[in-house]
Structure formats: C-alpha cells, structure tokens
C-alpha cells in the first residue's frame, strides 16, 4: 500500500509539473528501479481521477499522452482569465 501511495504521489507530481502530456512509457521512465507496469500506471491514473471527482480538474488522455486539465464545465469562468490578461 505504501508503494502505491508513493507511486500515486510521484505520478501526480509529474503530471502537474510537466509542460507536455506524459505517455505511459514516459511515466514509467521516471523510475530507475521498480518501474511500474503500464497497467499499474493506468490504475493510479484511475485512482487520481476518483480522488479528483469533486475537484475542478482531472487527468485526461490526449493524443500525445496524459495531462491534468480543468474539467470542461468551468469554461464559462476560465475563459475570462485570458481576456483579463490581454
């Protein structure tokens, strides 16, 4: 269990820190030893999305990998951010 908690924190941190989406292989490559399998990483991503169920963001799979992004229901408010900074 402790390994899964640590794995979750590492993957979550990597997704938040990365400027680009991360592939399953890219996430696995973060680990020098005890590399998680692609299925383990997918399970962690599912767990993160359960954890984020009541938050404004989620982990999504896009063409180039996984990333954390704001859920689509917040577009109305978030679109104002770019207008204000222009």
Predicted regions and their residues:
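Positively charged, polyanion-binding regions of nucleic-acid-associated proteins
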Residues: 4-18
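Charged low-complexity interaction tracts in eukaryotic proteins
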Residues: 3-6, 31, 46-76
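Short amphipathic alpha-helical interaction segments
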Residues: 36-45
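Amphipathic alpha-helical interaction segments
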Residues: 9-13, 43, 61
């Amino acid at each position: 269990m402790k390994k899964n908690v640590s794995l979750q924190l590492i993957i979550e941190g990597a997704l938040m820190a990365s400027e680009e989406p991360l592939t399953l292989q890219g996430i696995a490559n973060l680990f020098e030893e005890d590399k998680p399998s692609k299925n383990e990483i997918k399970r962690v991503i599912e767990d993160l999305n359960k954890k984020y169920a009541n938050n404004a963001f989620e982990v999504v799979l896009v063409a180039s990998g996984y990333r954390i992004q704001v859920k689509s229901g917040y577009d109305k408010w978030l679109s104002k951010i770019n207008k204000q900074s222009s």
